[in-house]
């Protein structure tokens, strides 16, 4: 799991860890930022969040968002490391 402060993109959140891993694998081959899964428990259910980052600049954030959208892999949301 990534640590530290910065800007991240959350591409998806899944109850099924296999679905999260599949998306992580697809993203790893197409973006330069690190891709990782961050698991949390919400409402007694584990969610596996697929994120990329940290991303250093606003331009890189925009480029990564566009790459994900063009590949039809979701609508990434900008998040910070503590969300």
Identify the role of each PLM range.
Residues 1-7:
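Long, low-complexity, acidic/serine-threonine-proline-glutamine-glycine-rich intrinsically disordered tracts
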Residues 9-13:
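Conserved short N-terminal element of RNA/RNP-binding modules in eukaryotic RBPs
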Residues 15-83:
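Extracytoplasmic
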């Amino acid at each position: 799991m990534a640590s530290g402060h910065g800007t991240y993109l959350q591409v998806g959140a899944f109850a099924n860890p296999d679905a999260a891993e599949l998306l992580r694998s697809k993203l790893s081959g197409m973006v330069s930022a690190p891709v990782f899964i961050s698991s949390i428990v919400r409402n007694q259910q584990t969610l596996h969040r697929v994120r990329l980052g940290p991303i250093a600049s606003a331009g890189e954030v925009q480029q990564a968002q566009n790459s994900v959208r063009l590949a039809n892999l979701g609508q990434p949301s900008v998040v910070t490391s503590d969300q």
